C-alpha cells in the first residue's frame, strides 16, 4: 500500500490542551550551569572505559558550586568498596547514605524513604491549606482573639516537618554486573518511572553504554559518553539516541573525540547535542 494523500477532519468539540501545574519544578532550582542535566527526574548515564575520566567528571560536578554542590537535600551513593577506596579524599566520604552493594533491599528502602518524604510534604501543604480555610471562615471582628492565636500557631512548625520540596539524587557508580540481575532491574525500573514525582535524579556510570539494560535505556534523559572503544559501539549509540546514519555518525565522532577526556552529551528531551558540555549547532540538509 502506498499513501497518496492524507486529509485531517477537524473535531469542532476538541478541547484546547492546558498543561496542569504541578507542585514540583520542571527544572531543579539553583543549578547555574544550564548545559548539564537540570531537569527534575533526570535519568543520566555516564559511560566510558576505565581511566576515561567519567567518575572524575561526575565527582567534580558535585564539588562545583555552579553545578551540583549543595543542590540536593538527599544523596544516595552506591559504589563498590574497591572503587571507593581507590579515590583519595573522596568527596562523599562523609555522606550518610553510602552503599557498597547494590541490592533490591537497599533500593526498596530508599524508594520507601523518598515516598515518605513526598507524602510528608503533601501533608504539610494540606495542613497549611486547612489552616487558611479555617481563617477565611472566621469573622475578623468577632473572632479577633482566635485569629491572632491561629497566626501564632501557624508560625510554630514541627522541627521534623518537611515544609519544602526535597530534591534527591541516587548515584549508581560502576555496577554493570549487578544491573544484569532481573530483580534489581525491575526495582530500578519501578523507581525510574516515578523519578519525577519523587523529585529524584538518577545517575549511572558504566564502562559501556551497551552495558546499561535496554529496558532502563529507554528512560534515559541525558547521556554523557566518553570515547567508545570502537566505531561499532559508537554507531550503536548514535543509532539508538540520535538516529544518525554511519557517515554522519563518523563525522560527529571525529569532531567530538579529537582530544583526551572529550565527551559527547545528548539531551533526549530537548534533542540537544553537546561537546564537553558546550552546545553544538548542527546544520542538516
Q: Which ranges hold each PLM region?
A:
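Nucleotide-state-sensitive switch-loop elements of NTP-binding domains
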Residues: 95-105
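N-terminal pre-Walker A segment at the start of P-loop NTPase domains
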Residues: 1-33, 82
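Conserved P-loop NTPase motor cores
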Residues: 28-33, 41-65, 69-70, 80-84, ...
Amino acid at each position: 500500500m502506498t499513501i497518496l494523500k492524507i486529509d485531517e477532519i477537524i473535531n469542532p468539540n476538541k478541547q484546547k490542551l492546558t498543561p496542569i501545574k504541578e507542585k514540583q519544578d520542571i527544572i531543579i532550582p539553583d543549578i547555574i550551569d544550564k548545559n548539564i542535566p537540570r531537569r527534575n527526574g533526570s535519568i543520566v548515564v555516564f559511560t566510558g572505559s576505565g581511566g576515561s575520566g567519567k567518575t572524575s567528571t561526575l565527582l567534580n560536578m558535585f564539588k562545583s558550586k555552579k553545578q551540583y554542590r549543595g543542590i540536593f537535600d538527599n544523596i544516595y551513593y552506591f559504589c563498590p568498596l574497591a572503587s571507593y577506596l581507590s579515590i583519595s579524599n573522596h568527596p562523599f566520604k562523609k555522606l550518610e547514605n553510602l552503599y557498597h552493594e547494590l541490592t533490591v533491599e537497599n533500593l526498596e528502602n530508599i524508594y520507601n524513604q523518598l515516598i515518605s518524604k513526598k507524602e510528608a510534604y503533601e501533608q504539610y501543604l494540606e495542613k497549611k491549606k486547612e489552616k487558611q480555610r479555617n481563617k477565611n471562615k472566621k469573622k475578623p471582628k468577632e473572632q479577633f482573639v482566635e485569629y491572632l492565636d491561629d497566626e501564632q500557631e501557624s508560625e510554630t512548625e514541627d522541627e521534623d516537618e518537611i515544609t519544602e520540596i526535597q530534591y534527591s539524587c541516587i548515584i549508581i557508580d560502576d555496577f554493570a554486573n549487578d544491573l544484569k540481575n532481573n530483580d534489581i532491574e525491575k526495582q530500578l525500573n519501578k523507581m525510574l518511572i516515578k523519578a519525577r514525582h519523587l523529585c529524584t535524579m538518577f545517575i549511572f556510570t558504566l564502562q559501556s553504554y551497551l552495558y546499561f539494560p535496554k529496558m532502563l535505556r529507554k528512560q534515559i534523559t541525558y547521556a554523557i559518553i566518553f570515547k567508545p572503544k570502537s566505531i561499532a559501539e559508537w554507531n550503536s549509540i548514535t543509532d539508538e539516541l540520535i538516529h544518525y546514519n554511519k557517515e554522519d555518525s563518523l563525522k560527529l565522532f571525529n569532531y567530538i573525540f579529537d582530544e583526551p577526556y572529550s565527551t559527547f552529551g545528548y539531551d533526549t528531551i530537548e534533542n540537544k547535542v553537546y561537546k564537553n558540555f558546550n552546545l553544538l549547532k548542527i546544520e542538516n540538509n
